[in-house]
């Protein structure tokens, strides 16, 4: 590729506008680098759009029939098909079907293994980057294939709600093995935040639970069997594999796509007579109520990716920007939540909306356990004198989170969460 060895803008959809808008600066030894505005950025403005270096759908999400493009994670169901499955009602009919952007006629399959892509462009992109190495050919349903054994082992260790994917690491390896310029890709992956050995162990512990040491060694052996490459031999050692695991656990950006959500946003933009608007809004409200009863919180095709420029954004509990996926694929849009002045740091939140509303103590606990830092944003500094206590409701939620980490959920619980999806 033509990009320079240190080009953090290489995967932006429009590189030059991004270069004129933001820059990378060193912040501190604790924070490392950060993303800063070069010019005034207005509230609601898209700061940049970026493709990931690699991405992958979560294993359980794919297993439970959340059909997504194997490359860009675009939802392959039409909005109506999506609504029918999520609500458990095959008779759901959506008005304004022309607002759905999914085109089944464009879908393509790998001729060797039959995985599905949303378009010929995605099939080609995957084949050129990593799929020639990772294609299962006729062994897609063969449990003895090394890659299938690796995926099965991962599913038995990391249950919903999912936060990482072993196949993201596999695609990193596949990308380098298949690349002509292997050093370029190795350098790109080296740009992501690295941790000390003790910090890496904490991240692995968080992802795999109490038995993480034995599980990590099992995963590493399967990873070696499936993907070993001499050029990246360090990644396959116990220390290197732990580092690779921690890199994905710390830097992986969650991706969510939904053809139904995209259709709803398109409906919101329609100019309708008041009575028609009221009728449409009532239909959508009832649909989401029905979906919540059947599906709960699992609405999207979900996965994670590594984004070179976006990974430079530090956290704040009062972010001035947010990442989203409005195109129903893996293209990340970073959007300003408020006016941002030249020289001001651009921060996102690593916490969801509910977590940001928790007490300072609870927020710090989540950030410390998942990202290994203590937040010093304006909100946390303003609340520094608050006692280190949590509400009863927050304690219950934390106990549930901790219980998920301690071991495997019961099969019945999984069925309750994801049945009929």
Curated annotation (Swiss-Prot):
It is found in: Cytoplasm. InterPro entries: SET_dom, SET_dom_sf, SMYD5_SET. It is an enzyme of class 2 (transferase). One of its GO terms (biological process) is positive regulation of cytoplasmic translational elongation. Residues 20-351 form the SET domain. Pfam families: SET. Its main location: cytoplasm. Residues 386-421 are annotated as: Disordered. A zinc finger (MYND-type) spans 97-135. It catalyses: L-lysyl-[protein] + 3 S-adenosyl-L-methionine = N(6),N(6),N(6)-trimethyl-L-lysyl-[protein] + 3 S-adenosyl-L-homocysteine + 3 H(+); L-lysyl(20)-[histone H4] + 3 S-adenosyl-L-methionine = N(6),N(6),N(6)-trimethyl-L-lysyl(20)-[histone H4] + 3 S-adenosyl-L-homocysteine + 3 H(+); L-lysyl(36)-[histone H3] + 3 S-adenosyl-L-methionine = N(6),N(6),N(6)-trimethyl-L-lysyl(36)-[histone H3] + 3 S-adenosyl-L-homocysteine + 3 H(+). GO terms for molecular function: histone H3K36 trimethyltransferase activity; histone H4K20 methyltransferase activity; histone H4K20 trimethyltransferase activity; protein-lysine N-methyltransferase activity; zinc ion binding. Keywords: Cytoplasm, Metal-binding, Methyltransferase, S-adenosyl-L-methionine, Transferase, Zinc, Zinc-finger. The keyword Zinc applies. Belongs to the class V-like SAM-binding methyltransferase superfamily. Protein-lysine N-trimethyltransferase that specifically catalyzes trimethylation of 'Lys-22' of the RPL40/eL40 subunit of the 60S ribosome, thereby promoting translation elongation and protein synthesis. May also act as a histone methyltransferase in the context of histone octamers, but not on nucleosome substrates: trimethylates 'Lys-36' of histone H3 and 'Lys-20' of histone H4 to form H3K36me3 and H4K20me3, respectively. The histone methyltransferase activity, which is independent of its SET domain, is however unsure in vivo. This is Protein-lysine N-trimethyltransferase SMYD5.
């Amino acid at each position: 590729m033509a990009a320079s060895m240190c080009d953090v803008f290489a995967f932006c959809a429009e590189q030059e506008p991004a270069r004129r808008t933001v820059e990378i600066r060193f912040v501190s030894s604790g924070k490392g680098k950060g993303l800063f505005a070069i010019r005034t950025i207005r509230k609601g403005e898209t700061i940049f759009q970026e493709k990931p270096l690699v991405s992958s759908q979560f294993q359980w999400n794919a297993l439970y029939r959340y059909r997504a493009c194997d490359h860009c994670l675009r939802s392959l169901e039409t909005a109506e098909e999506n609504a029918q499955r999520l609500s458990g009602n095959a008779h759901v009919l959506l008005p304004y079907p022309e607002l759905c952007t999914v085109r089944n006629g464009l879908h393509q399959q790998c001729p060797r293994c039959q995985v599905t892509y949303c378009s010929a462009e995605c099939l080609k992109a995957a084949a050129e980057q990593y799929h020639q190495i990772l294609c299962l050919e006729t062994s897609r349903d063969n449990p003895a294939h090394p890659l299938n054994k690796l995926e099965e082992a991962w599913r038995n260790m990391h249950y919903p709600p999912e936060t990482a994917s072993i196949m993201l690491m596999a695609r990193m390896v596949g990308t380098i093995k298949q690349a002509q310029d292997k050093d370029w890709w190795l350098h790109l992956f080296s740009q992501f935040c690295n941790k000390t050995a003790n910090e890496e162990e904490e991240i692995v512990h968080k992802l795999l639970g109490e038995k993480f040491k034995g599980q990590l060694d099992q995963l590493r052996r399967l990873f070696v069997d499936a993907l070993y490459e001499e050029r990246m031999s360090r990644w396959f050692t116990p220390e290197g594999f732990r580092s690779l695991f921690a890199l994905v656990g710390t830097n992986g950006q969650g991706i969510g796509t939904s053809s139904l959500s995209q259709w709803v946003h398109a409906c919101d933009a329609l100019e309708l007579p008041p009575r028609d608007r009221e009728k449409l809004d009532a239909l959508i409200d009832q649909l989401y109520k029905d979906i919540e009863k059947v599906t709960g919180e699992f609405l999207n095709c979900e996965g994670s990716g590594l984004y070179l420029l976006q990974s430079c954004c530090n956290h704040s509990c009062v972010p001035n920007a947010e990442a989203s996926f409005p195109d129903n694929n893996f293209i990340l849009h970073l959007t300003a939540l408020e006016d941002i002045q030249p020289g001001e740091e651009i921060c996102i939140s690593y916490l969801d909306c509910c977590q940001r509303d928790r007490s300072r103590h609870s927020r710090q606990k989540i950030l410390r356990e998942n990202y290994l830092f203590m937040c010093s944003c304006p909100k946390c500094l303003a609340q520094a004198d608050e006692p280190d206590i949590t509400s009863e409701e927050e304690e219950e939620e934390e106990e549930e989170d901790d219980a998920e980490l301690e071991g495997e959920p019961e099969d019945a619980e999984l069925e309750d969460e994801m049945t009929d999806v």
